Every structure is written in C-alpha cells, then in structure tokens.
A protein has these predicted regions:
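N-terminal Lys/Arg-rich, disordered targeting/topogenic segments
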Residues: 1-2
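A structural signal for multi-pass alpha-helical bundles of membrane permease subunits
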Residues: 8-305
Length: 305
C-alpha cells in the first residue's frame, strides 16, 4: 500500500496470483508451440522412408516452395469456395430468423424453445455430423432410396463422386452447425437497438422492409463485421467435416482439399519444415483479419462519439 495525493492506494496481490494458471497454460500450450513452429519453418526437417533428413537450416526456402507450388493456391481456392458456399446462406438465414425472433410486434410464441432448437446443432461434434451425412447420402443410403422410390432417379446418385454435390454437402453441414450461433449473435444485436427508433419509423409510415434495411442493418454493422471476420477465420481453419466426409483425400479431384487438410497431410508425412511454414502463413492471415475486426469496430465507436 502507498499514498497518492493524500489517499491510500491498496494493491491486491491475489489478482496477480489468480492470473498465474492462465499465464502458465498460455505459455505452455500457445506461446511455446508458436515459437517452435516459427523456428521449424526455417529448417528442412522430414522423414524419407525410415531416414530422418535434417534439421538443416534453409531460410525462406520452405515459404518459397509453398508460394511457387500450384497446390497451395488450389487448396486456398477450395477453402474460400467452401466458406462462401456456407456463409452466404448462413448469414441470410440468421438475419431472417434474428429479425423474426426479435420483432416484438409479431408476438411469436415459444421463441425460447425455438432458440434452443436452433442452437442445438452447434453442440453436436463435427465427426458425428459428418458420419450422419455420410450415412444419409451413401450410395445405398436413405436419400438415394427415397429419390429412387419417388422416381426422381433410376440408379443411386454418387454424391461424393461429384464436385458440386461434395462441396454442397460440406457447405450444408457447416451451415447447419454454425447458423444457430450466428443467429444468437445477430439477435442479441437486434434486441440491443433502441426501440424508440422502430416506433418513430412506424409512426412515420415505414414498412417492415424499410425498417430492416434503413435502421436494423446499419446499426448491426459492428456485429456483422465481427460475424464475417470470425466466420472467415473459421473457414480458413475448415478441416474436420471434409476430412471425415472424404476420408482425408479431398476428392473428387482434390476439389474439397482445404489448407488445413493439406497441413495435416504434411504433418502426417512428418514434413515439419513445410508444415511450420504453412502454419505461419495461416497465423499471419488470421492475425491480419483479427486486427481488421478491432480496427473496424474502433472506427464505428469513433463515429458514434
């Protein structure tokens, strides 16, 4: 305790003590692996059969190989296509449901129940979800049997042998898994809007569509930016669903191979140097997008002030 301006200022050491477990966990599981990954990215270190090659310092050679390789650009394109296919229907569905559930004038009943149901898919493990869809859309699965019974197709459609249907299933699964979380976020933002604005618009004769596009959407901008950026970061880390659904092959013709699946293949083949370089690149992209969130949010706060 020390005196400042005639007043006693007391410092509570227990606050710092309670931070120790968090700091230890962060250093052991976050900081040390990050530094190790960056270090390994500058070395040639892989297994050739049963022979260990390296570690040999190669500088930026691993990064050069990644950027000059045609594979990484194809996998980056696959990742972005899958994210766009998932995010567009997800954001539209979430905005629609959020507007419905937050609109007091509709007087909807059972909103708590439906909010719970909407969020439930978010609690299901991706592996379970993938196995469910794999069973449903298998050659002899229920979906093919139903389509043949109603005469829509004459023979089983191989969903996982066509680029469009494989990507569509991956996007559909991710959309179903995450739209509940997005809906809750947008709904919270809508409920935080001053109701007097809606009342004034109603008195002025504005329609529901005009209110949504002129009042709700502009005031939701900070949350929408957050949702877009976090969804993009999650899209860059897409792994479990396509990995399980395609058995790690990314087929057909590697059209569903994502960057993280490519990273996993490098790690599985014990190519630690290239894996480290790819991890660093993904980390930089994620960091840039995270900074963009705070910058855009900060600009919005300044405008309000």
């Amino acid at each position: 305790m020390r005196k400042s301006g005639g007043k006693a200022v007391r410092y509570n050491k227990w606050g710092y003590i309670f931070l120790i477990p968090f700091i230890v966990v962060y250093v052991v599981f976050q900081l040390v692996p990050l530094i190790t990954t960056i270090y390994n990215s500058f070395f040639e270190n892989y297994m050739s059969g049963l022979t260990q090659v390296g570690p040999n310092f190669v500088g930026f050679e691993n990064y050069e190989k990644l950027f000059t390789s045609g594979d990484i650009w194809q996998y980056f394109k696959n990742t972005m296509v899958l994210w766009i296919m998932c995010f567009i229907p997800q954001i539209f569905l979430s905005l629609l449901l959020g507007a419905w559930f937050s609109d007091v004038s509709l007087k909807l009943k059972g909103t708590r129940f439906f909010k719970t149901v909407i969020y439930l898919p978010n609690l299901i493990m991706a592996s379970a979800f993938s196995l469910l869809f794999f069973t449903l859309f298998a050659d002899g699965g229920p979906i093919n049997n139903l389509l043949m019974q109603i005469g829509f197709i004459s023979e089983p459609y191989k969903f996982l042998s066509h680029v469009g249907s494989t990507r569509g299933l991956i996007a559909l699964m991710n959309c179903l898994m995450w739209f509940g979380n997005t809906t809750i976020l947008l709904m919270a933002g809508m409920l935080g809007i001053d109701t007097s604005l809606f009342e004034a618009a109603e008195v002025g004769g504005a329609t529901s569509t005009q209110v949504f596009f002129k009042i709700t959407l502009p005031l939701l901008r900070p949350i929408l930016i957050y949702v877009i950026i976090t969804s993009l970061i999650g899209g860059l880390q897409l792994f479990d669903v396509p990995q399980i659904l395609t058995n790690g092959t990314g087929n057909p013709v590697r059209s569903s191979m994502t960057l993280i699946m490519y990273l996993n293949k490098r790690l599985y083949s014990k190519d630690y140097g290239m894996s480290g370089a790819l991890s660093v690149i993904l980390f930089i992209i994620t960091a840039i997008l995270s900074i963009a969130v705070f910058k855009l949010s900060g600009n919005d706060d300044k405008r309000k002030e």
